[in-house]
């Protein structure tokens, strides 16, 4: 099997792309590194395609290894034929390989095996030959042997039938046909063990659906209902058609003596041996597909959660709500440092609302708190009421956000949290985590087991190893997509960086604590156990602000520094210009469209294009000296200018792409590929850009809405909290997420909600119905 050619066909990419990617993987390169820094080799395959390629590569290599093991085993038994070898070599799945190996596989003791030990195989072959003319009992009498346990002709015939049944069951072609027919015509049936019992599985109490049509989330629901002993689930196959097919294959001659025997043997082979195995195989395959689908959805939801836009530059009050033990508070400054913690008791049974408000007002004034980050757990509803009342009483603007606190309690009780906050109790750690989730979701959520974050479906029922690996890959891709500040990143964040293990991550933090801030990327090579290969893999994802080299603050890889510097020289850009641009980009809230009032370089005209970018505005300021003319050119081409002296030269800054006439030629001159050149240009044009800025910011609230206030037709704005196969759950600010069924998401037909929405999206919804008793809210995203 040409694995690379097969991968190219499956993924619909060029074989050369597969060849290059497989080589890079085999050389020990990580997926994030290949996706970001080996685009020329792979043809710019993204991390999702690369992950799929890697997964299939591992499967197909394991398949080839298993084929060789099977072939060796059959050859050792001296039973290999050219036809069998070809079938094994051509097999595309493990199931087919195992079906072909079944007749030759060493078996545990079976009825057929026992019959063979009793010497009944010749009788079985005699019956299969279908040429007996006399009484079968007379033929069978010759095999009576009390020492071997064959006490009668009937016992001999029964043993022979067991041997034939196993032969029928072991035939790979028969199994292939039966499996295919069952997939096409079989049904999944379920019934309640107790019809009168109320449960969440009521829709499955008398349920049936074709195997070929049943969707993943129903399979997972049926599996859970069966595991909880609420449902009985089975697969109903077209048994009549299957037995008829087997009879045609096995009964090849008209023989009134052997035909009835073979008919009953075929029925036994199917019902006792084949049907249970095929049902198990198909249900396992359905479950595997359902799990893969659910894991994929979980992964996409997790990615959206991790890539939420950070709320920076704000002092945040984290609020972990509770009843009896009180609400834990933590004030966190703009850098994530915890300034203060306390506990208030505004909820039952204490109900000390006035005291709680007094404490809150004092903290808000003392620490200039801008935002309250409220966890959505127990007592969240009651806490929100207090917050809303408080906001109305304040003399300064304060808003609040309800944050999904899933996993916060897991983190707060972890060894990591204990190391980070040794003097805090569990509740205080949780409050600090809830505040930080708002400031930098990615940095905070990486500290929590992804499975505990709660944006999936049936995650606790799945293959935990597969789920864990898939979610870890999502976190790894997200962290590397954003990059980390080498001087502030925690070990929890660093360990997800390409090429960095948990041990090396801790070593980086220890090196930083002992030697102070990193001033350049090369210093990473001084970290214990971080060698040249790890450095190659990680360096481009590590950022150093205000370091020796401004390129260290970009995603330009050190291996491309020489090319980047040559490019800057050709475009008349200095390192100081880049530094100035980075500083300007880092100033949050500054209007980058503001015209720089300084003068242009003497004797030159300064043309700043695309002044809405921080780069354009900053470099305009950075290059200004006395004399010359400043021309601010907006995206629409209109310009305004201010003379400062005569000039005969012109420096064009802003859209660097437009200044390059022949990119291919320039890339060759710089000794890099065109794609790498494009990436370097983007980094220079938009320094310090965070890809999370493209995501929607969370909804900041200052008032409260009650579920009883909801009326059909009411239009609201909400945040998508979870995406599942049959719809999306939207937080509309009433402490009970509403469900938008997949049929209500958009006017056009979609197979899955992810085609239209993602976790974290801000969406407009309309109330369809409200069920106060069951606490269910039905919403629609359709217009009108």
Segments (PLM) and residue ranges:
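Single-stranded RNA-binding regions, centering on S1/OB-family and related RNA-binding modules
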Residues: 552, 564-784
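Long, charge-rich intrinsically disordered scaffolds of nucleic-acid metabolism proteins
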Residues: 96, 401, 407, 412-482, ...
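A glycine-rich phosphate-binding loop feature that marks nucleotide/adenosyl-phosphate handling sites
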Residues: 180-188, 319-323, 378-379, 403-410, ...
């Amino acid at each position: 099997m040409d694995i690379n050619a097969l991968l190219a066909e499956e993924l619909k990419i060029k074989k050369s792309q597969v060849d290059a990617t497989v080589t890079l993987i085999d050389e020990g390169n990580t997926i994030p590194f290949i996706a970001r820094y080996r685009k020329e080799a792979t043809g710019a395959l993204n991390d999702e395609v690369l992950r799929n390629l890697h997964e299939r590569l591992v499967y197909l290599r394991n398949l080839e290894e298993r084929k060789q093991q099977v072939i060796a085993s059959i050859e050792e038994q001296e039973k290999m034929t050219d036809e069998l070898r070809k079938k094994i070599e051509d097999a595309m799945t493990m199931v087919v390989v195992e079906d072909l190996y079944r007749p030759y596989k060493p078996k545990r003791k079976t009825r057929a095996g026992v019959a063979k030990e009793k010497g009944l195989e010749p009788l079985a072959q005699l019956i299969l030959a279908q040429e007996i003319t006399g009484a079968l009992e007379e033929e069978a009498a010759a095999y009576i042997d009390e020492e071997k346990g064959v006490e009668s002709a009937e016992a001999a015939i029964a043993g022979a039938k067991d041997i034939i049944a196993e032969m029928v069951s072991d035939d790979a072609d028969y199994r292939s046909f039966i499996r295919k027919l069952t997939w096409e015509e079989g049904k999944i049936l379920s019934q309640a063990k107790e019809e009168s019992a109320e449960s969440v599985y009521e829709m499955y109490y008398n349920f049936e659906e074709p195997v070929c049509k049943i969707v993943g989330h129903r399979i997972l629901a049926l599996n859970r209902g069966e595991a909880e002993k609420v449902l009985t689930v089975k697969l109903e196959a077209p048994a009549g058609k299957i037995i008829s097919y087997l009879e045609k294959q096995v009964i090849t001659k008209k023989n009134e003596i052997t035909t009835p025997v073979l008919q009953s043997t075929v029925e036994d082979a199917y019902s006792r041996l084949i049907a249970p195995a095929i049902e198990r195989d198909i249900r396992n395959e359905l479950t595997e597909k359902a799990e893969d689908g659910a894991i994929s959805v979980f992964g996409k939801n997790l990615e959206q959660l991790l890539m939420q836009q950070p709320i920076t530059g704000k002092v945040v009050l984290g609020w972990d709500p509770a009843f009896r033990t009180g609400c834990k508070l933590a004030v966190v400054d703009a850098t994530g440092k915890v300034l203060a913690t306390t506990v208030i008791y505004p909820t039952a049974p204490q109900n000390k609302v006035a005291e709680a408000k007094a404490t809150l007002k004092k903290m808000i004034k003392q620490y200039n708190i801008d935002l309250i980050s409220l966890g959505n757990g127990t007592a969240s509803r009651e806490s929100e009421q207090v917050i809303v009342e408080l906001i109305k009483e304040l003399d300064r603007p304060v808003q609040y956000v309800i944050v999904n606190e899933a996993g916060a309690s897991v983190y707060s009780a972890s060894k990591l949290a204990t190391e980070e906050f040794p003097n805090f109790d569990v509740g205080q750690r949780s409050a600090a985590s809830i505040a930080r989730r708002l400031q930098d979701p990615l940095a905070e959520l990486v500290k929590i087991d992804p499975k505990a974050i709660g944006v999936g479906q049936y995650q606790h029922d799945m293959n935990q190893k597969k789920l864990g690996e898939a979610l870890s890959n999502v976190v790894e891709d997200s962290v590397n997509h954003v990059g980390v500040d080498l001087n502030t990143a925690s070990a929890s964040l660093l360990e997800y960086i390409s090429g960095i293990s948990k041990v090396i991550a801790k070593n980086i933090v220890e090196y930083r604590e002992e030697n102070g801030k990193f001033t350049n990327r090369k210093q990473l090579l001084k970290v214990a156990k971080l060698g040249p290969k790890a450095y190659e893999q990680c360096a481009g994802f590590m950022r150093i602000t205000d370091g020796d080299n401004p390129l260290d603050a970009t995603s330009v890889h050190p291996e491309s520094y020489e090319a980047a510097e040559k490019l800057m020289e050709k475009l008349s850009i200095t390192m100081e210009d880049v530094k100035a641009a980075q500083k300007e980009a880092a100033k949050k809230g500054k209007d980058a469209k503001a015209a720089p009032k300084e003068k242009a370089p003497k004797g030159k005209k300064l043309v700043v294009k695309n002044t809405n970018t921080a780069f354009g505005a900053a470099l305009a300021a950075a290059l200004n000296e006395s004399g010359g003319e400043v021309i601010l050119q907006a995206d629409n081409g209109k310009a305004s200018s201010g003379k400062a002296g005569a000039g005969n030269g012109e420096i064009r800054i802003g859209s660097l792409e437009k200044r390059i006439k022949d990119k291919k030629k320039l890339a060759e001159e710089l000794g890099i590929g065109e794609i790498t050149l494009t990436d370097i240009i983007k980094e220079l044009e938009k320094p310090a850009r965070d890809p999370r800025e493209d995501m929607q910011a969370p909804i900041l609230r200052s008032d409260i809405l009650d579920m009883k206030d909801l009326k059909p037709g009411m239009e609201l704005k909400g945040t998508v909290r979870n995406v599942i196969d049959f719809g999306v759950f939207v937080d509309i600010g009433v402490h009970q997420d509403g469900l938008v069924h997949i049929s209500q998401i958009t006017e056009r037909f979609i197979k899955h909600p992810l085609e239209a929405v993602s976790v974290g999206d801000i969406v407009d919804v309309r109330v369809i119905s409200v069920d106060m008793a069951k606490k269910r809210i039905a919403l629609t995203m359709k217009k009108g």
